[in-house]
Structures are given as C-alpha cells and as structure tokens.
From Swiss-Prot:
Gene Ontology cellular-component terms listed: cytosolic [4Fe-4S] assembly targeting complex
Segments for region (Disordered): 94-113, 118-137, 295-316
Biased composition (Gly residues): 98-107
GO terms classed as biological process: iron-sulfur cluster assembly
Nucleus is among the record's keywords: no
PANTHER family hit by this protein: CYTOSOLIC IRON-SULFUR PROTEIN ASSEMBLY PROTEIN CIAO1-RELATED, WD40 PROTEIN CIAO1
Organism, scientific name: Botryotinia fuckeliana (strain B05.10) (Noble rot fungus)
Annotated WD repeat ranges: 10-52, 56-100, 147-186, 195-237, 243-297, 328-367, 389-433
Name of the protein in question: Probable cytosolic iron-sulfur protein assembly protein 1
Keywords for the protein's UniProt record, in alphabetical order: Repeat, WD repeat
PROSITE patterns (UniProt xref): WD_REPEATS_2, WD_REPEATS_REGION
Length: 436
C-alpha cells in the first residue's frame, strides 16, 4: 500500500490552515479553518472553492464543525471556534443538497435572523443582528456565542446534533444546546466543565448507546476525561484516562466497522467503543472500558419506566490502555482519524509524516481461546507538505470522477503551508516508507 497525491484544494489559504472537516450528511463538501479568520468550504467533486465564511471573527479560526442532519428549510449549519474566544454559528440555504457540490456559492441565502432576536445568557447577536458588509455573500453569520476567557481550540457537535461543545485555553469546556424553534438562533449554556487542570486541546463525541452521548476531552494536563449528562440536566466527569506523558492533541472514537468480532456469542453485552488518542509524547493509544457487572436488584439508570428520583446516578467508569500503535512519529502527533469504512487509522503531526495502521488478527489465545490482535503499519509518507507541519488529517469519502468504487475513501491533510491536500490509497504496493 502507498499514499498517492491526488489533488490540492484551490485556492489555498495564504496563511496556516488548521483543520478540514468533511460534511457528515453525505454532501460533497469539506470545511477548512484557517488563520486568516475565515473558513473555506471546498467541493469534493473537483477540489475547488465552493463558498467562504468570513467577517465573523477577529482572530484565527481554529476549528469548524458541521451540524449533523439537515434542517427542514434546507439550511446548512457550521459552528466555528476562534482564537478571539468566541464561537460563531453560520447558516446557508443550500442548493448543493442535490449532491453535485459544483455550484459556485450562488444558492439561495438565509438573509433573516429569526424570531425577535431574543437569545439566552452567554449568547448575543453579532452587532445586534445587523448585516455586516464585510461578511461573505453566501453564508450568514447568525449568532456569536460568548463565554470563554481565552482562545477556543476545538468545537464539535454531538452525533444527534443536540449538543455543541467548545474547549479552550482557559481550561474549560462549554456545552450548548439550541433551544429555539428552527430559524430562531437561540442557544443556552447547559454546562461548563472545569475538571481539566490546563489548556483543553480537543473534544470528541460518542453517539448514544443507550446511556446517553459521551464527550471525551484531551488536555495539556496529559489526561483524557469522559463526561456525560446525568439524566437530570447536570453534566459530570465519569472517567479519567491517565497514561500519556505529554499533551493529548486529538481523540477519535472507534467506528462500528472495527467493533465487529468473530465471536458468535449473541448473548454477550454490546461492546463499548474504544477510544483513540494521540499525544505530544509521540504515541497513539487505544483505551477500552473495563467491564463492570451490573448491580443486582438495581434498576437501570436510564430505564424510562423508573421515576427519575429513584434512578441511581451514572457511576464512575474505569478505562485502561489496551494497545499502543507502533511508533512512527518523531514529533508530537497532532491528529488521528479512525476510518468508518475499513477500521484503519491514519495519523500525522509535527514531523510532516502521514502513517496508516491496521489492526490484524494474530490467532486465538491457547488459554482462553480469545482472539489476539495486533496493530501494524501499512505505509508511511514523509514530507507530505514539504518542510511544513501537518495540523490535521481525516478520512473522507471520494466524490470525484476518479474513484473506483462508490465507497472509496481518501485521506485529507491540512498544513502550516495553507494547503489542504487529498491523497488516494494504492493497495498492493510493496513500498512502505515514501517521500512526497
């Protein structure tokens, strides 16, 4: 296997590009956050600029997140987090819902901020809701969310779209909920988590498995925290994962494709997704929840048939590091991504390398008969952005005419050179370590 350069997204940013986030709703669009205070939305069909979000922030846009699902009026939503300590909500009524992704940003626009402008504490309309002449002419900067005291490092919507999380250099994580009717742009702060002891670098949601959606966060304090809502509206930390010896830069939850096992025991409890983490200690770790037997004669916490006053609160969980991927990187690993199609992992970081790993079966344990697996390196590409650091990597579905199968994936990297690059995967190639 090897990575082959497919395309550069045009035009590139004139300054550092931080991260590129594919649209989660199947649209051929990807949003790139940049240091020039804007977000570029590119078409995945032809790797060209689709539209631009600009005029809403006073400093670098560090992170962007698409809201899952599509509103009934067809509007797309992107949340942005900036070094100016604010988060922005952007709307666009999108013709590109037809899936072609080729329009030049001339689709119908959402020009009005809904309702009477009433917003909750912690949120206010930018400049009283007046149209900003400096804003991009295709996306509307609908609302600004304020509360952080310092740079926002990451923003993320929960899989259901109910929650929006932001983390900051101020050591806090804010969780927001959109409470107004569609088009009203009314947000409420539902929690401010303050359990990290240093700069919080990343947040990553796990979908609801019957126990509520879970938020993982990584920090400069070298720890990972897991938090969730207790059913009464309060959020609390349910697990602390310790083991890294440097800043935790990125997290990703295990996709369903890699959770499938060869076990035929249908009576076993559903597996809890594993958590992937990367760090300044140049390691990539996999964390697994330690199973705990259910308490006897005790109702399930989230059983809707039990009155809330009788349900026990969520108990603390124990997690352990169950695997460490082979060492490839020589500098901090800024970004990782776990493929929803193949279960492979891709990583990148300050050394400019891109590495792809795969979990393979070794055999069965002779004692307990359990399946033994190991992670192997499939390929390493060096100097992918020349001498520049790579800040972000993600798996992404291919939409261009060159794809060989409907579900074919590519790798997207975003770097300090302002470039967003697409890489295709060539299987059955012997070379393992290559230079771009």
């Amino acid at each position: 296997m090897r990575l082959q350069h497919l395309a550069d997204f045009k035009p590139q940013a004139a300054t550092r590009a931080w991260a590129s986030i594919p649209n989660p709703n199947g649209l051929p669009l990807i949003a790139t956050a940049t240091s020039d205070k804007s977000v570029r939305v590119y078409s995945l069909n032809n790797f060209t600029l689709h539209s631009t979000l600009e005029g809403g922030h006073e400093r670098s846009v560090r992170s962007a997140a698409w809201k899952p699902g599509v509103r009934t009026d067809g509007a797309l939503t992107i949340a942005t987090g900036s070094f100016d300590a604010t988060m922005g909500i952007w709307r666009r009524k999108e013709d590109a819902g037809n899936g072609n992704g080729n329009d030049g940003g001339d689709g119908p626009l959402e020009m009005e901020i809904g309702a009477d402008g009433e917003v909750s504490k912690g949120a206010q309309l930018r400049r009283g809701g007046e149209e900003d002449e400096d804003e991009g002419d295709d996306w509307e900067f609908s609302i600004v969310l304020e509360g952080h005291d310092s740079e926002i490092k990451n923003v993320a919507y929960s899989p259901s779209g109910q929650w929006l999380a932001s983390c900051s250099r101020d050591k806090t994580i804010w969780i927001w909920e959109e409470i107004g009717e569609e088009g009203e742009d009314e947000f409420e702060t539902v929690a401010v988590l303050q359990d990290h002891k240093a700069d919080v670098k990343c947040v990553c949601w796990r979908k609801d498995d019957g126990n509520g959606e879970v938020l993982a966060s990584g920090s400069y304090d070298d720890t990972i925290l897991l938090s969730r809502e207790d059913g009464e509206g309060d959020w609390e930390t349910v697990a602390t994962l310790e083991g890294h010896e440097g800043t935790v830069w990125n997290l990703d939850w295990e996709p369903e494709v890699s959770m499938k096992t060869e076990s035929s025991d249908e009576s076993s409890a559903p597996a809890t997704p594993r958590l992937l983490s990367s760090s300044a200690d140049m390691s990539i770790r996999i964390w697994s929840k330690v199973p705990t037997p259910p308490p006897q004669n005790k109702p399930s916490y989230f059983n809707p048939g039990i009155p809330s006053t009788m349900r026990p609160g969520p108990e603390n969980e124990t997690w352990e590091c169950t695997a460490t991927l082979p060492k490839v990187h020589d500098l901090p690993i800024y970004s990782i991504s776990w493929s929803k199609q193949t279960g492979r992992v891709v990583s990148t970081g300050g050394d400019g390398k891109i590495a792809i790993y795969e979990e393979q079966t070794k055999g069965r344990n002779s004692v307990g008969g359990t399946i033994e697996k190991e992670w192997v390196v499939l390929t390493v590409l060096e100097g992918a952005h020349g001498p520049y650091e790579i800040n972000h990597v993600t798996w992404c579905q291919r939409f261009d005419n060159g794809k060989k199968t409907p579900d074919e994936e590519m790798v997207i990297t975003t770097g300090d050179d302002g470039l967003t690059k697409a890489w295709c995967i060539e299987e059955n190639v012997e070379e393992r370590t290559l230079e771009a």
